[in-house]
Amino acid sequence: MGRSRCARRRLSLAARAALCSALPYADLHIGNVRAFIQPVVAYAVGVAPAAGPVDRTGVDILQGFAEVDLGAVTLRAGRQMLSLGTERLVGTRYGPNVPLAFDGVRADMTLGKAQLSLLAVRPVQPGPGSFDDATSDRKALWGAYVALPELDLYYLGYRNRAARFGELEGREVRHSVGVRSYGTRGAWRWNVEGVAQFGHYAGQRIAAWTIGTEIGRRLPALPLTPQIIMRANVVSGDRKANGTLGTFNALFPKGKYFGELSPIGPTNIINLHPGVALTLRDDLSLSIAGMAYWRYTKGDGIYDIPGNLIRGPGNATSRFIGTQVEAALSWQATPEWELSTSLSAFSPGAFLRQTGPAETIKMFGLESNFRF
């Protein structure tokens, strides 16, 4: 059993890339003991300037763990994928060709209506060849996540021995405390999450935060049963030379953070994201969205989803990064086979024009998922 996925992506009119991956697995249960193994086969062609670790890894072990079910407590050790809440800080990185896995231990407990997860892990760093994925010797993650009805509470600790923010590199120890409220009432649904971060980095203290909101309403009386969605995110950034690092670290977030093909990550940003989802048929859905991005502080630049700086602040005076429109169509052709396509265009704003090249990015994606 498993899943295979192929995608073709086109950025502007010149760049084309094809990415394919397969994730078969074997899952053995003997009494209260479970053994699970999942290889990954991931290749990429045409990625410019070169395919990175999230694009290809050859053939390797994505997951391989043993699990013991003790009733109210489940213990797991080995290589595993993690998904906490909405994957704002810890996710499977689905979207890029190579999902994210961790090596370590996890315990899940049921305490009345609460679900408690404890974890101590290190991320897996994919290599360019086969069977060369390795446990990170620089990064570590530990913490606790409590899921209650319509409420999540969590603490996550993170260490990076060689973190880089701007021109400075050093040891980062960061603590994240978060709360999430979510649920539905009739045709309305909501998902609101806030995170505060503190710690130290290269002789500076850390003080960072984020607030994300999503409010949606279904309109079942209208044709195509539209759902109107409004998302807004505010993520802190750094201010120059004040002895405090204000740059938020999203740790290990989901790959499709702001949309199917967004080039901007959740650091030093203000984002507005209205959209509508339509049910064309039981097996066919369409979503259309618009995004606008601003820098939260002028003293910090913009980052990609993994947290790498992609444009420094320079001498720019503008906060406005740009706008994006996106449409995604998904067809569940069979219970096992899903086809989807995405079309997106990102138009640069004044900040990008003030700091370097600023061309419109046009993106087109085709994706096929087969679960067997």
Task: Please place each PLM-identified region on the residue numbering.
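Hydrophobic pocket-lining residues within nucleotide cofactor-binding pockets
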Residues: 1, 82, 235
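Beta-barrel outer-membrane channel/assembly domains of diderm bacteria
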Residues: 1-79, 105-110, 182-191, 197, ...
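Signature for the C-terminal beta-barrel architecture of outer-membrane proteins
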Residues: 32, 71-75, 93-241, 279, ...
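Solvent-exposed loop/turn segments at secondary-structure junctions
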Residues: 42-44, 81-84, 124-125
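Short, solvent-exposed polar/charged micro-motifs at secondary-structure junctions
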Residues: 47, 87, 162-165
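"Short basic amphipathic alpha-helical interaction patches in structured regions
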Residues: 51-53, 90-95
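Short acidic (Asp/Glu) patches
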Residues: 60-61, 90-91, 101
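Acidic/polar loop-and-plug regions of large Gram-negative outer-membrane beta-barrel proteins
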Residues: 241-257
